[in-house]
Amino acid sequence: MIAMGSPKAGNHNDLYEIEEVLKEILAFLEEAGIEHKGLFLNADAGFDSQGVREYLEGKDIVANIRENPRNRGERDNYFDEKLYERRFIIERTNAWIDGQKALLVRYEKLDVNWVTLHLLAFSLFFLRKIKV
């Protein structure tokens, strides 16, 4: 997990304003000096949209998105099951975040405070992982 978008209301589906979120994430990576070309995006079936796939392809990002059974048809999309198994790392991180009471429920009124708490949590998670 190298970047995140700003918080969105919980009453929308995963694809709500997804291109704006992706633009925000790519701008964050660019500002940090991280090259995004050639990276891959592992996403679950909730993000299975031809628009998302085309947007990522236009940015030279590999879309490794599990197909949503409701969207099946004549599509021939790339999907690497082995690569997708690494998504467990993201799910484990999300579960760890859910275990932190201050992060589980959004008490902050300002988006910047919510984002800052999450960045602090990610830093703590990273430091624990490298055992500093």
Regions found by a protein language model. Give the residues of each.
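Helix-centered, glycine/charged polyanion-binding patches within enzymatic domains
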Residues: 30, 35-40, 45-110
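Short, glycine/serine-rich, charged loops/turns that create anion-binding
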Residues: 9, 46, 124
